[in-house]
């Protein structure tokens, strides 16, 4: 899913760079969700960054032992389509030598368990990826909560 940048002239530049390898981005609205569902029902593969802070909704689930706001989009899509969920990431190699791809075994229970358990399983998979290369994770997402309330000042 893709949200246009605030600087109008950057949109096409960013899209060209990101879609150059054959991927397709969909908007971060209901039409984008419908496009993702359609792709999954056709047996296509989609990619979602499950650690993004949801703009609305979401559920608190453990993440490194602390409650973290977790999107329910991945759980919902997997549950509606019985899609296999595979987690992976691209590790940047030193000296700009490229990337090493890492994939975890599928967790089939993400698509069949209640939302709370599914969210916890998603966060556990994200944790496994982070532990493989913690220095490469973008730690700025404001996912952590205190007693269900946001405590970030900005």
What kind of feature is each model-predicted range?
Residues 30-154:
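Non-catalytic C-terminal accessory region of glycerolipid acyltransferases
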């Amino acid at each position: 899913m893709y949200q246009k940048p605030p600087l109008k002239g950057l949109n096409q530049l960013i899209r060209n760079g990101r879609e150059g390898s054959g991927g397709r981005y969909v908007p971060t609205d209901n039409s984008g969700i419908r496009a993702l569902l359609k792709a999954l029902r056709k047996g296509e593969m989609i990619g979602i960054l499950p650690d993004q802070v949801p703009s609305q909704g979401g559920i608190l689930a453990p993440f490194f032992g602390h409650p973290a706001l977790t999107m329910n989009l991945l759980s919902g899509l997997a549950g509606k389509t019985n899609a296999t969920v595979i987690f992976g990431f691209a590790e940047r190699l030193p000296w700009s030598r490229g990337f090493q791809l890492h994939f975890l075994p599928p967790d089939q229970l993400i698509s069949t368990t209640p939302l709370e358990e599914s969210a916890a399983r998603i966060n556990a998979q994200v944790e496994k990826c982070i532990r493989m290369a913690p220095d490469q994770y973008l730690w700025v997402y404001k996912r952590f909560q205190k007693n269900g309330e946001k405590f970030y000042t900005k």
